[in-house]
Amino acid sequence: TLTPDMIIPSAACVLQANLGAKNAAAYDLQAACSGFVYGLITAASYISSGIYKKVLVVGAEILSRRVNWNDRGTCILFGDGAGAAVVSEVPEGYGIKGIDMGADGTGGSALCIPAGGTAVVANDQRVEEGLTFIHMDGPEVYKFAVKTMGRTVLKSLERADMELNELDYFIPHQANIRIIDSAAKRLHLPMEKVFVNLHKYGNTSAASVAIALDEANREGRFKRGDNVAFAGFGAGLTWASLVLKWY
């Protein structure tokens, strides 16, 4: 999440208390809109190393409290939502086959909340100036996303030793329909193999892929053995993708 209840304790610790999961380790992972895919990859690493047997990954945002409602360039894009997945071991041959993660911190100013950390402390003046809200260079983020989304999935496919024509379904971060269309074209996927629910919720950042995954699963979009790709990109600038064989 990039919208925790408070700086400390972490949102994960608040959730752990509410769930009564008192024996579970808990921490926040912040990679903005890439966060859920980062979380899945991190959880899978714990599972494959034998450290943990089950890991709960949650993406949750209240972005309506972090947008300036006078800025039509951002306030109409973002939404509130939450989604989760329990990651555990699956039979051999299934599960995550390839991953890709990356970041380019030099592009951080293209999508940021300038005040509220320790570099620029939030106060009445900075709230009045709108510095505690999301600031976005739309054209720059669009160029980054179009370049990155398809490329990161191709890298995950390569690491999974899969060909592009073996991909059965794609769950992209729900930020912009033009970005999703562009990624689908680069992956040579018809839109019926790409899940889109952007029109329902807007951009829910770290919750986006989690919500889309749940809805696609409930709608019966996957069958056992399907090769499914997930991809996210976001503030940082960050990106991540994975390809798994559905179980």
Model-assigned labels for residue ranges:
Residues 8-10, 67-71, 239-243:
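Short acidic, glycine/serine/threonine-rich loops at helix termini
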Residues 6-20, 57-63, 118-127, 179-191:
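Acidic-glycine-rich active-site phosphate/pyrophosphate-binding loop
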Residues 3-5, 17-18, 22-23, 31-48, ...:
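Claisen-condensing/thiolase-fold acyl-transfer catalytic domains that form or cleave C-C bonds
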Residues 48-82:
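Flexible, glycine-rich active-site loops centered on histidine and acidic residues
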